Amino acid sequence: MHCPFCNATDTKVIDSRLVGEGHQVRRRRECTECHERFTTFEGAELVMPRVIKRDGTRQPFDEEKLRSGMLKAVEKRPVSIDQIDQAMNKIKSTLRATGEREVPSEMVGNLMMDSLIELDKVAYIRFASVYRAFEDVSEFGEAIARLQK
């Protein structure tokens, strides 16, 4: 670790503590040359897989796109922001747990539908109608029938 004061390359760790619910390590360091002290934070870099779209193109996972879709689905429904955050964290954890560098967009959509069905059935129908491109009332009826099973 380079000293931010004198740019020396040799520093020593004086103290280490877990912070952020154990997801980060706070380290107090001292430069062996100028003896200045400074604090660093370490955390694991969790990389999300890339998304393979239906047309075959690949793009980085976009958390804002996921949040936007979920917010549209739950609009004017009794679902809290905390519930949305929990659902999004569950989706991201599931995607990371695949261990794959790339995942199909269908997987992301299906995970979102699974989350919405637990949060709010009306929100699920809203999202499914757009995601599955329902074209007539019978498709809505089939989706509702699946919910009632």
Swiss-Prot record:
One of its GO terms (biological process) is negative regulation of DNA-templated transcription. GO terms for molecular function: ATP binding; DNA binding; zinc ion binding. Keywords: ATP-binding, DNA-binding, Metal-binding, Nucleotide-binding, Repressor, Transcription, Transcription regulation, Zinc, Zinc-finger. Disulfide bonds: none annotated. Its cofactor is Zn(2+). InterPro entries: ATP-cone_dom, NrdR-like_N, RNR_NrdR-like. Residues 49-139 form the ATP-cone domain. A zinc finger (unnamed) spans 3-34. Belongs to the NrdR family. Negatively regulates transcription of bacterial ribonucleotide reductase nrd genes and operons by binding to NrdR-boxes. NCBIfam families: transcriptional regulator NrdR (TIGR00244). This is Transcriptional repressor NrdR. It comes from Shewanella amazonensis (strain ATCC BAA-1098 / SB2B).
